[in-house]
């Protein structure tokens, strides 16, 4: 009887993001640009850490795994959302929905665990520097990462198998842009008590456990930093942990506000917007947050990119680029309003790494600024391209 009920539902309808009427093409261009920047930035970090011998250390090994997890995490939801926007057919099969749940939980939990491992790595490096080489040896580092992969794969599989046994009778509209676990539980006409019990026990342990590990690690780090006598050593310790703290705050802040502290007044649309922060924005910002103050990583990122530069070139920020692209970057830089130091650092970093990537980011920014403009999307995109390329 349960299988008969399940056979009634062969696909779900994803409502997607709450876009204004006539603005879907604009949102498509925006999220496509953000997704391309996410993939490019994270894969550059993986390439740099794999090819540069100076980056063969536990810290960069964990960072490369975090970048891989971010690429897969973003690719679990964003391509399907873009395909639905492009085809205007927001349908996902039952099997596709279960697959999306599995990989979403797998790579989301993997992000969570690797952030905890990176916090422990920073703790050993700052609080126990003399034993760092023996404690964080290559074998132990690899074992920690493999353990993270195995635990998250098993956890995601348990949730997916429990979801597969549920029945969905008539309701098949998912008020989200991807198959969210909690949303599907509300649509089921079966008893979901076992699913909710596993979410509370295992899900809570997999989320709160690594978070507590990060808090404990940074509590010891802060006490150790306060005892540093020199200002230079203090500044170096803070800069080493600052990027990781920024990523942790962004990742856990959005998840805690959405899942652990749900507001009764929050609408479904607001929940979808918050979900964009940890599915799209966090994987996008991770490579930039980790690279802004890391000279070794910046130099490693430049080396493989130089292989793609041919012909008559000149240097921009240490990276050789073609003259036409460099002129485009200079024109775009002159048109940007550098009102804050943070924005200035991000823009200079993009110019330093890849001017083409810089143009994509500026294009995304201008699309977001004109998000609610009444202009025709095709005309607006053409206007924005002209505005970026010509001073």
Residue ranges and their predicted role:
Residues 1-355, 362-365, 371-381, 385-391:
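Transmembrane helical core of 7TM receptor-like proteins
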